[in-house]
Amino acid sequence: MQQNTVTLILVGVIIFLFISLFFYVIYSFVQKKKNRNFKQIKIQPKKNNKITPTSDQKLKADEFISIINKKREILNHQRADYLKIKETQESYQQLQEVISEYQKKLNLEKIKLIDQMEKEIKDNLNEKAVYYMINAMEQHAEDIISSKFSFTIKLENEGMKGKIIGKDGRNKRHFEQTTKTDLIIEPNMPAITISSPNPIRREKAKRTMEKLLETKNMDIAKISLFYKEVEEGFEQTCYEIGKDALENKLHIFDIDKKMYPIVGQLNFRTSYSQNVLLHCVEAAVLAANIAQKLNIDPIKAKKAAFFHDIGKAVDFEIDNDHVNSGVELAKKFNFEDYIINAIESHHNKVSPKTVYAALVKVVDKLSASRPGARFVSNDEYFKRIEELEKICKSFEGVSDAYVIKSGREIEVIIDPSLVSDDECKILIKDIKFKLEDSDLVNKQPIQITLIRKFTQSITTLGSASRLRT
């Protein structure tokens, strides 16, 4: 009985413990669920408070992001370009240094090449050129004839002066009015002078005076009569002179005979005191001889050279220069185009279109540049000297220039601080080419000398400054 009681108590205790454990488990489960619900309740407001963007906002955000990305790309490109530019600038500076160094070497090579080419050209052509020119000029050597604007006629005695002057100067005055020249009679001079810039008038007056002096009697009627006779025969004289020049000297026969008197008038015209007809004949012969050496038509060369100054036969009678007058005459007499081009191009009014026109320019200068062939006035000489010095001084590094020996030599003073020895070799070539391009050295060669020297001076102390203590 007592044992059963104990057993029941134990069973009851076990049941109590089991029930307590059951309730504890249930309580724990409930508490966990409450805690979970509490967390969900606590977290839920955060989820509900989140801002949900609209479609417009998303679109704007995407556009903004796109703009930022584009800006980033632009910045990246600019940065890349900057780096490239920086590298390019550095490379350019290096390139400039290389170019500068190469330019110096190139200048030296240029000097060597120029010297070599000049030597080859001189070796190959100088001998032939000298031969051709000497040969051409040997075949036609004209006497040097220098004319002026006046004729001087010697008188047999002083008594002739009174007859020439006439009563109250009537004879002299009538002679001047008839011939349109100046009659100069100076005391204590056994001669009279006829002066006029018009060569035809001067020649007619000279012939009239010679006829009057032969009669030894002079009056107004005889002056008019003799002048009329001279004037009537003068055209025939010019015709004969022109015929002699064309047919006998140059063997040109296919020219209109009406051109002969005009050609003859060239005999009375001068250019820088050189007889124009003789100049034209000489140029024609030179052109023909050179043309033969060049294997071109010597007849065409001869014609083009002879007629290049034909305008000087009439230009003193009209208000025109001799080139335009020559072209008008050539067209009037139906000259061929190559002759017309030679006339209008020999003073560079137009460019030469044929080899004959170019040849005319050469022989024109050859004839005009013969020693003594032409007289140059002091004003023209000094003007030429000034122009030569001006051209030399136009180059950088040239401090001064002096023309010496009547224009045959030029001394060019170089600043040594601006021009090196090597650069002098290039400078002297540049000066040479520029002078040759001008019209100042076409008549004779000019020797150019560069003078580059370093000068430094110092003054010594006087004896008073050297007293010893």
Curated annotation (Swiss-Prot):
Pfam families assigned: HD, KH_1
The protein's enzyme class: hydrolase
Chief location category: membrane
GO BP: any one term: mRNA catabolic process
SMART domains: HDc, KH
Domain of life: Bacteria
Gene Ontology annotations for the cellular component aspect, listed alphabetically: plasma membrane
Membrane topology: Single-pass membrane protein
Any GO molecular function: RNA endonuclease activity
Keywords, comma-separated and alphabetical: Cell membrane, Endonuclease, Hydrolase, Membrane, Nuclease, RNA-binding, Transmembrane, Transmembrane helix
Sequence ranges assigned to domain HD in this UniProt record: 276-369
KH domain residues: 149-209
Alphabetical list of InterPro entries matching this protein: HD/PDEase_dom (IPR003607), HD_domain (IPR006674), HDIG_dom (IPR006675), KH_dom (IPR004087), KH_dom_type_1 (IPR004088), KH_dom_type_1_sf (IPR036612), Ribonuclease_Y (IPR017705)
Keyword Cell membrane (UniProt): yes
Family label: Belongs to the RNase Y family.
Protein name per the record: Ribonuclease Y
